[in-house]
């Protein structure tokens, strides 16, 4: 991504009230990931005034199940590779704060045991059964990427990943709350089984977020289109979200999630997931003075960064 594209993205997020962000990478060759991470580091180091601050990266791929790859490019999937991961992590100055892995892949357990001392390890794009999921969490994974999506559904005789995560109090679960990736009833259900302290709202938005309907864009080396507010690949697969995190939070409240739980899931909990809670995520003495002043119905907001209104 070019420098002006990175800054345009950060400017858009700040405008809508997302004052910090942690973008996700895609399943790509290491040499491409290396360049993308270097670009992200430049933006994080620059931190231009008035732009949303890049606090970390979620490495979403390439250690994924082919069956549950979703919109990830299958040509670049590979088994967990700690040496390769560490080369990328060191190359970007430790900016990777979450690394995703499908625990049923060969070498996944050892990868998790090693990577947990480097950053948060998340179970993602997986066809794992209940036992493999429990193994992953016992080995040190403490996060579940976009709950419900790119993983087996809950079944009473084959519970799978979701119950394994829910019954482990150390595991947080992400949820894309755009009204498309999960039904409102399943949003309420997620908050009821994980609790407000363990839910992390995410936008999962691609570069199409904020773009006009009909826009064509690139996603992990694949063409995608924004049609009627939905981002899709050429074969119709949902590519990503086109909703920002503020709107995801408002959606959660409108879907029936307690206001305090939705706000926490869009602020403090994600800050904890990327080890940024000492800086952001809540209004406390010594933290960065980033906050929003919202109308009662959340239709309007005033955005403050470092104590200054944008």
Regions found by a protein language model. Give the residues of each.
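Active-site mouth loops of central-metabolism enzymes
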Residues: 1-4, 25, 71-78, 120-124
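Divalent metal-dependent hydrolysis catalytic cores, especially in the metallo-beta-lactamase
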Residues: 7-36, 52-65, 92-104, 120-122, ...
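Short, electropositive alpha-helical surface patch
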Residues: 33-48, 111-120, 258-265
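His/Asp/Glu-enriched, well-ordered alpha-helical/loop segment
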Residues: 163-173, 191-203, 209-293
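Glycine-centered positions in the ABC transporter ATPase nucleotide-binding domain
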Residues: 306-307
